[in-house]
Amino acid sequence: MGIRRCKPTSAGRRFVTYHDFSEITKDEPYKPLTTCIKKRKGRNNQGRITSWLKGGGNRKLYRIIDFKRNKHGIPAKIESIQYDPNRSARIALLKYMDGEYRYILAPDGLKVGDTIMSGSGIDIKVGNALPLKEIPLGTMIHNIELFPNGGGKLVRSAGTAAQLMAKEGKYAHVKLPSGEVRLINVNCFATIGQVSNLEHENVIIGKAGRTRHMGRRPSVRGVAMNPIDHPLGGGEGKSSGGRAACTPWGKPEGVKTRKNKRTDKFIIKRRK
């Protein structure tokens, strides 16, 4: 795992960097665990744009990932570490003792040939999935469930890890990468270790076309729009907009947008 630099043969390649993919052991995905997903381009079922700056991008197969880790008590051997175009982390192909194959998020340090398990009463080892009540305090974890049997929802991107801080009754205190401390049911499962591909944050995209290949469209400044499109739009020449920075709907910049009030009681400390 490392970063590869390019010779500055053009302006677009002068600062661009790439992964060297040295940890990848197989190029082709396991076909039974792939499927096609239609791109929505940020549109809803009425064709209206609900998420800006999306569209285009390279074609890719979706790899079906096992976020639940619900095959308990059966050892699985790591067959290969693979690239997944749908996420920043690497994925690992498991072969269970009963012959079933599954993909999981590859933790950092996992190698081909290693054996991992999930369930209660197993060893505290990188790649193993256990309920929070059985994990020692201070352990680095990822792929954390929010509710029992709900599948991993938190801490899934490259290089991230959460820390188990305390246990109190039926809840555990988990410190997330954002700095937020959250109460999570002790029966929820989490995977031991840190997510793979630690160098992901150091990759320099380097040129606009590479961002378009990822399916991201250009972002237009509000002051460059017309008055009908944005509160900062219009004016003669290059104007500043005449007011404080705001959203296209007039809300001041920096206003909290979190809507889920029923789970506020589970947040002990807000993110930084």
From Swiss-Prot:
Q: Which one Pfam family would you cite for this protein?
A: Ribosomal_L2
Q: Where is the composition biased (Basic and acidic residues)?
A: 263-272
* GO terms, biological process: cytoplasmic translation
Ranked from the top, the taxonomy reads: Bacteria, Pseudomonadati, Nitrospirota, Thermodesulfovibrionia, Thermodesulfovibrionales
The ranges of region (Disordered) come to 222-272
GO terms for cellular component? large ribosomal subunit
Any one Gene Ontology molecular-function term assigned to this protein's record: RNA binding
Q: Which UniProt keywords apply?
A: Ribonucleoprotein, Ribosomal protein, RNA-binding, rRNA-binding
Q: What is this protein called?
A: Large ribosomal subunit protein uL2
What the record says about family reads: Belongs to the universal ribosomal protein uL2 family.
Identify the domain of life.
Bacteria
Residue ranges crossing the lipid bilayer per the database entry = none
Function text: One of the primary rRNA binding proteins. Required for association of the 30S and 50S subunits to form the 70S ribosome, for tRNA binding and peptide bond formation. It has been suggested to have peptidyltransferase activity; this is somewhat controversial. Makes several contacts with the 16S rRNA in the 70S ribosome.
What NCBIfam families does UniProt report for this protein, alphabetically?
rplB_bact (TIGR01171)
Q: Which InterPro entries match?
A: NA-bd_OB-fold, Rib_uL2_dom2, Ribosomal_uL2, Ribosomal_uL2_bac/org-type, Ribosomal_uL2_C, Ribosomal_uL2_CS, Ribosomal_uL2_dom3, Ribosomal_uL2_RNA-bd_dom
- Binding partners and assembly: Part of the 50S ribosomal subunit. Forms a bridge to the 30S subunit in the 70S ribosome.
